[in-house]
Amino acid sequence: MACCIPDELKEQKRINQEIERQLKRDKRDARRELKLLLLGTGESGKSTFIKQMRIIHGAGYSDEDKRSHIKIVYQNIFMAMHAMIRAMDTLNIQYINPANRENGNMIRQIDYETVTTFDKPCVDAIISLWNDDGIQECYDRRREYQLTDSAKYYLDSVERISQQDYLPTLQDILRVRVPTTGIIEYPFDLDSIIFRMVDVGGQRSERRKWIHCFENVTSIMFLVALSEYDQVLVESDNENRMEESKALFRTIITYPWFQNSSVILFLNKKDLLEEKIMHSHLVDYFPEFDGPKKEASTAREFILKMFVELNPDPDKIIYSHFTCATDTENIRFVFAAVKDTILQLNLKEYNLV
């Protein structure tokens, strides 16, 4: 019997070693998932970024997926026109074509959240309204009320969108606005590593739900809409949107949960900034700006500096990119750089070497 003991011990040792190896494998496999938390205020472009990941690194959008967006595109058109019709009254702007007052009343009576079709009377009314110089003046003053960024894109495309065989394009899907409520996760596989992107609602009422997402975050991806420097909040019409974004960024980067998470700052909507800066001057909203007017590159560098200076930790690097979330090639290029940054920072932690 005594001679068997060493063999039993050997077998026990072998089993223990195998268990240890399996535990290490499990730990390694668990760590091959990177959690990327998308944060930012409402309408900064987080949901559009997720859609781009689906197009670039996922299955994309089938014809059935595209068809499921038809009524949401219709609703976005009605929602935009509703906002402008209301603003015509509040801003005291007159329709140039008197018939458009009646068209406005007709569209106003339709609850845009229940729209599922796009009938000819509505199509004709919306086209007539959009071509009215009064509505165009109202559109030019859009910073004085709440209007979605995609309003012009859709209203310029009403004839195409109203066709019976209409199938939304990828650009139509990217630009559609549906406020994120709750938490949306989108996992995708890249080079045998799972990137789990988590999008949370940006409006104030949604932010209390973020706390559940804070564990094991590899990287914070914080989106800022560059074009919001002259806009006010949906929730409060006397608070500047960019100031709100700065306050949120300051809070996020000082959270103890994110002490070991890398921070990547996306200064988004650079295309809208380039349009807007020609007639809306940054210095009117941020008096400390001393650069030239009508120069987008100087304006965006100033905005970047404002955010980077909110970082209290001199050892923490804020990685930054200027983006246009509706431009697939731009996001493809930027995310390739982001992926490399994240992997470089996590080589040892995630057993990638």
Swiss-Prot record:
Residues that hold Mg(2+) according to the record: 47, 180
Gene Ontology CC: one annotated term: cytoplasm
Gene3D superfamilies: GI Alpha 1, domain 2-like, P-loop containing nucleotide triphosphate hydrolases
Family note: Belongs to the G-alpha family. G(q) subfamily.
Subunit structure: G proteins are composed of 3 units; alpha, beta and gamma. The alpha chain contains the guanine nucleotide binding site.
Region G5 motif, annotated ranges: 323-328
InterPro entries attached to this UniProt entry: Gprotein_alpha_Q (IPR000654), Gprotein_alpha_su (IPR001019), GproteinA_insert (IPR011025), P-loop_NTPase (IPR027417)
Gene Ontology terms, MF aspect: G protein-coupled receptor binding; G-protein beta/gamma-subunit complex binding; GTP binding; GTPase activity; metal ion binding
Sequence segments annotated as region (G2 motif): 172-180
Region (G3 motif): 195-204
Residue positions of covalent lipid attachment, annotated as S-palmitoyl cysteine: 3-4
Protein name listed in UniProt: Guanine nucleotide-binding protein G(q) subunit alpha
Signal peptide: none
Coiled coil (UniProt feature): none
Keywords: GTP-binding, Lipoprotein, Magnesium, Metal-binding, Nucleotide-binding, Palmitate, Transducer
GO biological process, one term: adenylate cyclase-modulating G protein-coupled receptor signaling pathway
